[in-house]
């Protein structure tokens, strides 16, 4: 089993440096570790589509974004992914519980 601490270090080693998402109890360990590390800013979002927008802005500003969310939030962000990220080929790593 991969711990949240090891996983967060792997993400950092791959250059991911911007994190956002809707808080989720299943991802709370990873969110806590990321939020406590000054190298990995975490910005909580109120909805998944808003988090997609934050990731897009971060990518355009030179960051490598990660979106953390529950699987139930996928429907909320499909329009943002298809009308923004897909069209302009803006990558976002999605970690879904």
Regions found by a protein language model. Name each.
Residues 1-97:
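Thiamine diphosphate
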